[in-house]
């Protein structure tokens, strides 16, 4: 019996010993892998900060020899892009790396990015899509040459000189500055952050929404239509992003003065929903009567099905924040609207729009808010000189921007 127990204990001891060796080996392997990852991160970050950035600023893409670079359009070397995945996005990534590693190098790199953004902050407190370390005349020259030839990118065909909420530009920079401030309560970032908060509060309409650009300007009518930059804007999450930023300021800084503007913006979302049977949301609204409005030449006055899906989810988020069932009340009608716009299976096959999700449906992107008819966007030509967008009721293009 003793012999049997000794054998069993011997086997157990051997197994435990082997397990310990295995764990030790795995720990060494994991540590080696961790070290490799950390070293690679550091090398890549040093290259980006020392070789790629311009005074701590970034665009989107670069040739390997750095001879050319691009944001949403080709950029000068001295330009800094704000739209994601531009300079604020890099700043967020550096702070994330700092949290993951505890290495102060990443925080110092994030500081450099933040100071670059502060340099490019407009007097009004927001940011344009891009700024230029070579000065405003250099930026105007870019708009007059590169920007004005941006077919589809009509927002670059005119230099306003003001700030934009479009494409999360100002809000991405604002959220990064907020993170930088609360990370160590560094007072150096407080003035720029307060300037940004003041910009967001001043630019909010009394009804609760925000324009695409601010200070308000009306000097770029396009193809016979009014300048749309002053319209109340949901497109690209202008209102949701501004609201989220104020919520973050309320949570992180305890600012009581932002609570009422937050609530005003949230409850506006209920008012902006259209009545049945086309009970969705538009991308833009006129300020005086909250009616759907146009934007760029390929963005007609319409109810947008994609925006409607986004707003359904947002309304559920606002319900979770407030417990107010009014945020849920319009969701059934919005779902009925989306289901009513379902295109036949023949269109799904014809245009090769099959989804891996068996519950997904194909719908037109734009819907006439008065008639409920789909509005399909097409284009012809190849550039700003000979090209144009046009809208019709037939889905005939093999590569439309409408679904």
Regions found by a protein language model. Name each.
Residues 29-41, 98-111, 181-194, 250-263, ...:
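Structural helix-adjacent loops and short alpha-helical linkers that scaffold large soluble proteins
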Residues 333-353:
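C-terminal, active-site-flanking charged/polar segments
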Residues 52-101, 106-244, 259, 273-294, ...:
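Extended ligand-binding groove/face enriched in aromatic
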Residues 38-51:
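Mature N-terminal segment immediately following signal peptide/propeptide cleavage
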Residues 1-29:
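Bacterial Sec-dependent N-terminal signal peptides
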Residues 264-326, 336-339, 343:
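A compositional/structural signature marking long, glycine- and acidic/polar-rich segments
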Residues 395-402:
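Conserved small/polar residues in nucleotide/adenosyl-binding loops
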């Amino acid at each position: 019996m003793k012999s049997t127990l000794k054998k069993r204990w011997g086997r157990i001891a051997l197994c435990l010993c082997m397990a310990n060796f295995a764990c030790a080996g795995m720990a060494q392997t994991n540590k080696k892998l961790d070290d490799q990852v950390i070293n690679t991160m550091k090398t890549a970050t040093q290259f980006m900060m020392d070789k790629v950035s311009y005074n701590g600023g970034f665009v989107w893409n670069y040739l390997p020899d750095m001879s050319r670079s691009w944001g949403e359009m080709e950029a000068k070397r001295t330009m800094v892009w704000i739209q994601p995945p531009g300079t604020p996005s890099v700043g967020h990534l550096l702070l994330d790396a700092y949290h993951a590693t505890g290495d102060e190098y990443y925080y110092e790199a994030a500081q450099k990015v933040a100071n670059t953004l502060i340099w490019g902050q407009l007097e009004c407190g927001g940011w344009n899509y891009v700024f230029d370390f070579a000065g405003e005349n250099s930026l105007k020259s870019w708009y007059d040459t590169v920007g004005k030839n941006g077919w589809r990118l009509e927002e670059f065909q005119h230099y306003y000189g003001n700030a934009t909420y479009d494409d999360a530009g100002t809000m991405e920079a604002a959220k990064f500055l907020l993170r930088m401030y609360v990370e160590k309560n560094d007072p150096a970032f407080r003035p720029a952050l307060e300037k940004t908060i003041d910009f967001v509060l001043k630019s909010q309409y009394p009804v609760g929404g925000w324009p695409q650009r601010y200070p308000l300007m009306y000097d770029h009518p396009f193809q016979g239509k009014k300048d749309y930059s002053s319209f109340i804007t949901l497109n690209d999450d202008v209102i949701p992003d501004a609201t989220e930023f104020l919520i973050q300021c309320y949570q992180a800084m305890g600012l009581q003065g932002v609570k009422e503007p937050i609530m005003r913006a949230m409850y506006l979302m209920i008012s902006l929903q259209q009545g049945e049977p086309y009970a969705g949301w538009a991308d833009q609204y006129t300020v005086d009567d909250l009616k759907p409005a146009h934007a760029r030449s390929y963005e007609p006055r319409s109810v947008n099905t994609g925006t409607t899906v986004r707003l359904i989810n947002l309304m559920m988020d606002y319900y979770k924040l407030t417990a107010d069932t009014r945020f849920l009340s319009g969701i059934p009608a919005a779902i009925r609207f989306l289901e009513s716009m379902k295109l036949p299976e023949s269109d799904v096959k014809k245009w090769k729009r099959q989804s891996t999700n068996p519950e997904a449906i194909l719908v037109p992107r734009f819907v006439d808010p008065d008639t409920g008819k789909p509005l399909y966007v097409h284009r012809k030509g190849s550039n700003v000189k000979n090209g144009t967008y046009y809208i019709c009721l037939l889905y005939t293009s093999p590569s439309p921007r409408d679904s």
